[in-house]
């Protein structure tokens, strides 16, 4: 395994092989039936590639990577938007053993510098310009701050650097990757500091996307819309773009997740499956009330990244059609899905149950003892697609993993008697108001259900007498008629919320800051209020 990575213990790895969770399946080289060669594989703003064309493009870029001097084991930071180059380059990396480190669209020079330095990356791959940001200038800053970069590869006009399109050469014979070698690096959520690198092997990631596609009934007739950035684990492999391509289906990459962009794509491409984070769902529901686009092809709408409040969840099928599937997981591994045939009550009120029968999950109290069903505790997990350690992070690993290899998620959950999980929040995401602990996610759900807002976040602000007071930050449904603090307090009291949980302060915003993976960035929110 790659230096700096933590392997599974050999007895555990052997068991995963023997039980069939890990096999010879490697990313990017999947068998196809003859009819799939001419079927659409990838649809982007630049056009459509068939499965055969995508395969050839990946082979040519793989040869181009090798001709440019990159080799198996080299790390490259991939910072591309939802365009064909992202997927072609990913497949080329999987075939050559070059290891992509997936940066997120919102990242800029500080984050890219951190990723390059941590991975000792030899290349940075970026677009020329997106939404007014010139990423060639970002590259210049990163080059000035790091020592390992040898290549800057630009999709579009390269300026002083190298055009990504120049990585084009006649295909060459390539040795098959070892399924248990690292294939790619994902990023942690970054809610507690700079993102950490998550090594994923061919074997574990192939199992994840293969099993996710089976559970979601994704096959060659399906069309998956990557509304979210395809570097996200959610949009990439749950089953996402890679799971859909492996199944012989079609992946459509949206340049933005907004309804005005995605609804026409759903109609035009006949999209059957897509994925959203909770802040986007109310916006799609509002847009669905007036859209003239035909959304009837949509079979499954996955929602994950944070808990979806039940009131909003109930509206999804009524407004958008298809089946809502709640997904609770982490780039580190464990995935939980509601099943497509679950009762409505399970789909609305829970975030699903584990993907694999080999997922080992504990819910523990503060003292480390196992919680009872219905009792809140921290989720700990290990399994055939859950990492055993972050990349080059021994100090972090010492606190985030138990001695027997369970990953400490930091998530507070409840497990029902039927085995489904309900996400309560994060261990450190509580407000200590005069000694009373205010669970912020609970209050946020009350706000979304009882107040006319499309987004809500509750944070603690310092107070000389109480230690902290609660502040509700909201985005109003109608900007011309924002709620007042009195409105909010009355609405929550009307729902029977305890007095200490009712917000002390209200801040109305145009939008909430989000992390790269679509979660509310409460650190940025606090900094915004302090400014």
Question: What name fits each language-model region?
Answer:
Residues 21-23, 38-83, 87-91, 108-113, ...:
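Conserved AMP-binding/adenylate-forming core of the ANL superfamily
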Residues 38, 169-189, 194, 199-203, ...:
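Conserved pre-ATP/AMP-binding loop-to-beta segment of ANL
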Residues 67-68, 98-164:
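Structural core segment of the AMP-binding/adenylate-forming
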Residues 107-114, 124-126, 274, 383, ...:
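AMP-binding/adenylate-forming catalytic core of the ANL superfamily
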Residues 206-223, 233-273, 287:
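Conserved AMP-binding/adenylation subdomain of ANL enzymes
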Residues 271-275, 287-346, 360:
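Gly/Ser/Thr-rich phosphate-binding loop
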Residues 347, 362-380, 417-418, 479-486, ...:
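Conserved beta-loop-beta connector loops within the AMP-binding
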Residues 354-358, 367-400, 438:
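Conserved ATP/PPi-binding loop(s) of AMP-dependent carboxylate-activating enzymes
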């Amino acid at each position: 395994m790659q230096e700096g990575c933590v392997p599974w213990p050999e007895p555990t790895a052997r068991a995963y092989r023997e039980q069939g969770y890990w096999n010879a399946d490697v990313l990017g080289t999947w068998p196809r039936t003859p009819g799939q060669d001419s079927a659409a594989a990838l649809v982007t703003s630049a056009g459509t590639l068939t499965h055969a064309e995508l395969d050839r493009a990946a082979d040519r870029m793989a040869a181009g990577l090798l001709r440019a001097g990159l080799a198996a084991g080299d790390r490259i930071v991939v910072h591309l938007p939802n365009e064909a180059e992202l997927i072609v380059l990913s497949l080329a990396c999987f075939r050559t053993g070059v290891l992509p480190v997936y940066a997120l669209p919102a990242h800029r020079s500080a984050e890219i510098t951190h990723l390059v330095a941590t991975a000792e990356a030899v290349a940075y791959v970026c677009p020329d310009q997106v939404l007014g940001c010139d990423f060639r200038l970002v590259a210049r800053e990163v080059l000035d701050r790091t020592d390992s970069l040898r290549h800057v590869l630009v999709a579009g006009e390269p300026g002083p650097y190298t055009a990504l399109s120049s990585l084009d050469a006649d295909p060459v014979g390539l040795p098959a990757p070892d399924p248990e070698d690292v294939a790619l690096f994902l990023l942690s959520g970054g809610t507690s500091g700079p993102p950490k690198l998550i090594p994923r092997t061919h074997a574990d990631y192939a199992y994840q996307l293969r099993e996710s596609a089976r559970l979601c009934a994704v096959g060659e007739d399906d069309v998956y819309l990557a509304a979210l950035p395809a570097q996200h684990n959610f949009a990439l492999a749950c089953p996402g773009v890679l799971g859909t391509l492996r199944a012989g289906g079609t992946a459509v990459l949206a340049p933005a997740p907004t309804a005005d962009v995605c609804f026409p794509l759903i109609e035009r491409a006949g999209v059957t499956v897509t994925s959203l984070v909770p802040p986007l769902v109310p916006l799609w529901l509002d847009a669905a009330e007036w859209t003239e686009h035909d959304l009837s092809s949509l079979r499954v709408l996955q929602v994950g990244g944070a808990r979806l409040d039940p009131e909003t969840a109930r509206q999804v099928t009524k407004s958008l059609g298809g089946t809502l599937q709640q997904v609770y997981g982490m780039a580190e591994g464990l995935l939980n899905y509601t099943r497509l045939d679950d009762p409505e009550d399970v789909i609305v009120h829970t975030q699903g149950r584990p993907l694999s029968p080999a997922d080992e999950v504990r819910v523990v109290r503060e003292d480390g003892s196992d919680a009872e069903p219905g009792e809140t505790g921290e989720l700990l997990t290990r399994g055939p697609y859950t990492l055993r350690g972050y990349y080059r992070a021994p100090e972090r690993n010492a606190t985030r993993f138990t001695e027997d290899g369970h990953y400490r998620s930091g998530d507070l959950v409840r497990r029902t008697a039927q085995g489904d999980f309900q996400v309560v929040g994060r261990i450190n995401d509580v407000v200590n108001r005069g000694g009373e602990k205010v669970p912020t996610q609970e209050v946020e759900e009350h706000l979304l259900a009882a107040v006319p807002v499309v987004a809500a976040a509750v944070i603690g602000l310092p107070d000389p007498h109480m230690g902290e007071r609660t502040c509700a930050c909201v985005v109003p449904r109608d900007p011309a008629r924002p709620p007042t603090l009195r409105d909010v307090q009355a609405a929550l009291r009307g729902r029977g919320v305890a007095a200490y949980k009712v917000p002390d302060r209200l801040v109305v915003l145009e939008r909430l800051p989000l992390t790269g993976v679509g979660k509310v960035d409460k650190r940025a929110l606090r900094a915004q209020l302090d400014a």
